[in-house]
């Protein structure tokens, strides 16, 4: 009994000597989550407040095409399609269920909220640390490129969501999870082929670091691509497959777009990107030393940043610009948060009080521990200011004036020549449902037979003044025959005050005495 009592006393003494866990990490995590909720609520409010603002031509194109699908049109056959089908299907489902434009803005906000939640979960899986995961979620919620452009109905938000969903099972590192990740990667490719760099990086990572999982991942990928391709071919025919993945091949190479996009990313998010690069280096070093416990997926994080950032190479093609960097923002947020919290993260090599004291000594890196969070705080404050300025911009009043002009001269269901967003708002139709006017102009330049027939039909209607009202912008101005026929039979009556990329000029048929 004496020995048992002595052992009990020693155990109690050791327990008393073990330092009590501090409450502040838990409070910090919940504080970060509360801030994320506040940011997402403010973002949703801003999206709804500017629901009818003209954000981007692509926004109008996807909305118009999705609305036509909800009315029974067939994508790639009845409606011009230049991207894989999933984003059109998402919009069509919302319209089919009775949703309006404000509903689509709510969908955009919901996609952003889901991406933020997945960034938090990915942070837990990659780094095994709730504080890092919470900081990554807050950083992602504030990054301005995604926050500004996610309000438009575009392919990039659902692509970002599916990229994160595809990463989540991959990081489980089991054959079954790898197969599921392959299927989700196929879904991401059927959202937009810009997922290809991340797919290549994932395959390279598995081949280099997790060879036994490469086979199951490829099985899921092949099965997913095969099933989706069969469904699409049955729905729209072989031409649908071509338009879905090669519909934008007519756009030329333009290195200037790449330079402008890189410059834009640097000016908007450069400080956070720099921290992410530093975080990737620290992450790579930690994963090589195997010192961080509870983070078996740590070695994937730098690969994720590299593959996601490679999406900027798509801007070498004209018509694709900096909004594609939305796909890289989860990786930027995750690695920046890791770099900031790296200096204060526990790294016990052993267990017990001695290990805790050793960790306290190694964790005292005051220069790094103070400088990096301070730098991120300054960067996020600047980013928040940019977010507020971007979301405060609205042009709904100018859009309403143009819509009123259309309503005054065209009935719902009438065919007009206009950017697709205005056709959607007024319930009118675009000739041939050729809503992607930029790709249409490029196909006219390449003498595509369908595009040439479209131009001949529209110019014939313009010459006969059968189209009641015409709205031109920088994309339709690239179609020279259209512009010539317009000048011959129509007169400009109004030009809005929007920026050049959104500016429209309203034309009405000339009177007989004009």
Model region roles, listed by residue range:
Residues 318-359:
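Hydrophobic/aromatic-rich transmembrane helices and adjacent perimembrane loops
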Residues 136-142, 159, 185, 189:
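Short helix- or helix-capping micro-motifs
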Residues 106-127, 142, 165:
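Transmembrane-helix motifs of polytopic, lipid-linked glycan transferases
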Residues 268-297, 302-309, 336-339:
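Hydrophobic, aromatic-rich transmembrane alpha-helices
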Residues 83, 194-195, 235, 373-513:
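Extracytoplasmic
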Residues 148-158:
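Short acidic/glycine- and proline-prone juxtamembrane loop motifs at membrane-interface regions
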Residues 44, 215-256, 262-278, 306-310, ...:
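Membrane-lumen/periplasm interface segments of specific transmembrane helices
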Residues 6, 13, 178, 197-225, ...:
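Perimembrane helix-loop-helix junctions
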């Amino acid at each position: 009994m004496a020995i048992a009592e002595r052992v009990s006393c020693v155990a109690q003494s050791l327990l008393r000597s073990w330092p009590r866990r501090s409450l502040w990490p838990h409070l910090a995590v919940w504080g970060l989550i509360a801030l994320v909720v506040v940011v997402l609520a403010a973002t949703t409010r801003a999206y709804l407040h500017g629901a009818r603002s003209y954000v981007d031509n692509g926004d109008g194109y996807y909305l118009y095409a999705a609305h036509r699908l909800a009315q029974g049109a067939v994508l790639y056959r009845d409606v011009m399609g230049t991207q894989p089908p999933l984003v059109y299907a998402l919009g069509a489902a919302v319209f089919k269920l009775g949703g309006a434009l404000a509903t689509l803005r709510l969908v955009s906000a919901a996609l952003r909220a889901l991406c933020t939640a997945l960034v938090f979960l990915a942070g837990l899986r990659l780094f095994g640390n709730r504080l890092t995961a919470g900081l990554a979620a807050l950083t992602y919620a504030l990054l301005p490129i995604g926050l500004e452009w996610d309000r438009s109905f575009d392919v990039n938000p659902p692509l970002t969501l599916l990229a994160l969903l595809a990463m989540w099972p991959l990081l489980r590192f089991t054959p079954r999870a790898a197969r599921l990740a392959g299927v989700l990667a196929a879904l991401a490719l059927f959202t937009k082929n810009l997922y290809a760099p991340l797919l290549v990086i994932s395959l390279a990572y598995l081949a280099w670091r997790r060879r036994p999982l490469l086979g199951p991942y490829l099985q899921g990928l092949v099965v997913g691509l095969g099933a989706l391709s069969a469904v699409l071919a049955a729905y729209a025919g072989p031409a649908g497959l071509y338009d879905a993945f090669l519909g934008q091949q007519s756009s030329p190479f333009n290195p200037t777009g790449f330079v402008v996009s890189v410059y834009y990313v640097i000016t908007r998010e450069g400080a956070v990107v720099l921290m992410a690069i530093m975080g990737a280096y620290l992450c790579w070093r930690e994963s090589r030393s195997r010192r961080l416990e509870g983070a078996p997926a740590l070695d994937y994080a730098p690969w994720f940043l590299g593959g996601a950032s490679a999406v900027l190479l798509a801007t070498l093609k004209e018509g694709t610009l900096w909004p594609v960097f939305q796909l890289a923002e989860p990786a930027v947020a995750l690695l920046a948060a890791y770099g900031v919290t790296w200096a204060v993260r526990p790294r016990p090599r052993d267990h017990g009080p001695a290990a805790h004291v050793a960790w306290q000594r190694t964790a005292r890196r005051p220069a790094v521990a103070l400088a990096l969070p301070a730098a991120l705080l300054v960067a996020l404050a600047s980013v928040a200011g940019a977010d507020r300025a971007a979301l405060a911009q609205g042009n709904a009043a100018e859009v309403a004036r143009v819509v009123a002009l259309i309503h005054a001269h065209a009935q719902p269901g009438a065919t007009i020549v206009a950017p697709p967003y205005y056709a959607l708002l007024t319930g009118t139709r675009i000739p041939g449902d050729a809503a992607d006017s930029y790709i249409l102009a490029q196909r006219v330049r390449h003498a595509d037979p369908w595009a040439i027939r479209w131009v001949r039909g529209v110019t014939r209607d313009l010459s006969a003044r059968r189209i009641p009202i015409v709205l031109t912008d920088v994309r339709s101005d690239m179609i020279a025959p259209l512009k010539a026929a317009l000048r011959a039979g129509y007169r400009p009556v109004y030009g809005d005050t929007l920026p050049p990329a959104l500016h429209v000029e309203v034309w009405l048929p000339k009177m007989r005495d004009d």
